[in-house]
């Protein structure tokens, strides 16, 4: 496991080497894997990871269903709420459905509407790894939404490299380092041989050069 001080040093370098900008940049992390056969589905990583401090960006969430879940969704301030009729309508509006699928990071759906979702929205959500998390009747979705607001989705498919946003330049190095640590711990727990299967890790700001993290 990488020491926190090593991560903080790499983050400081990434910020120092980045050209000064008049906007808040994202801080991105890239992980390159090795010694793993990604043609085998069982080796692929598909994880939702909670970042202790969030990544500093708005995470858009859509809730699909009716009744109590809609009330909770409104109270939670989710970006999109869709009932059964709207789900079915989107089945005949592929362009709009694709836009919704690309703009929202997470989807929650009442179990009662999952069959509708699969039929009408599955072709748009499935390939993006955004099929909804089923929510049984009576479940309080507010803590789920709160958790997802601070989460990132990693889906490698058959790729040996993947990148994700772990913070912004407005956040402290300590906060971003703790986010990176959470990602590394989860990824290593999914690799059969742990850090032996990690080739390299890089950190960069949106417009800055990549800085290698010493493993």
UniProtKB/Swiss-Prot annotation:
Identify the CDD domains for this entry.
Answer: Ribosomal_L1 (cd00403)
A Pfam family this chain is assigned to: Ribosomal_L1
Query: A Gene Ontology molecular-function term?
Result: rRNA binding
Q: Which UniProt keywords apply?
A: Repressor, Ribonucleoprotein, Ribosomal protein, RNA-binding, rRNA-binding, Translation regulation, tRNA-binding
Question: Would you tell me the Gene Ontology cellular component terms?
Answer: large ribosomal subunit
* GO biological process terms held by the UniProt record: regulation of translation; translation
For the keyword GTP-binding, the answer is no
- Asked if tRNA-binding is a keyword of the record, the answer is yes
Cited NCBIfam families: PRK04203.1 (NF003244)
Q: How does it assemble?
A: Part of the 50S ribosomal subunit.
- Its biological purpose: Binds directly to 23S rRNA. Probably involved in E site tRNA release.
Q: Which family does it belong to?
A: Belongs to the universal ribosomal protein uL1 family.
Task: Report the protein name in the record.
Answer: Large ribosomal subunit protein uL1
Q: Which organism is it from?
A: Methanospirillum hungatei JF-1 (strain ATCC 27890 / DSM 864 / NBRC 100397 / JF-1)
């Amino acid at each position: 496991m990488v020491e926190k001080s090593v991560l903080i040093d790499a983050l400081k370098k990434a910020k120092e080497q980045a050209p000064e900008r008049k906007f808040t940049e994202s801080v991105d992390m890239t992980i390159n894997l090795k010694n793993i056969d990604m043609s085998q589905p069982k080796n692929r990583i598909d994880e939702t990871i909670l970042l202790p401090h969030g990544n500093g960006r708005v995470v858009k969430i859509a809730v699909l269903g009716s009744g109590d879940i809609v009330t909770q969704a409104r109270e939670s301030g989710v970006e999109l709420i869709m009932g059964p009729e709207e789900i079915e309508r989107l089945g005949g509006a592929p362009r709009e459905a694709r836009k919704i699928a690309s703009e929202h990071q997470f989807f929650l759906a009442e179990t009662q509407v999952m069959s509708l979702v699969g039929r009408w929205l599955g072709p748009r959500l499935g390939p993006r790894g955004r099929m909804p998390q089923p929510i049984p009747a009576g479940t309080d979705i507010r803590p789920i939404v709160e958790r997802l607001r601070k989460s990132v989705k990693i889906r490698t498919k058959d790729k040996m490299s993947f990148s994700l946003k772990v913070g912004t330049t407005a956040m402290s190095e300590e906060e971003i380092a703790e986010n990176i640590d959470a990602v590394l711990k989860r990824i290593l727990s999914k690799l059969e041989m742990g850090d032996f299967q990690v080739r390299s890790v890089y950190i960069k700001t949106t417009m800055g050069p990549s800085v290698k993290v010493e493993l």
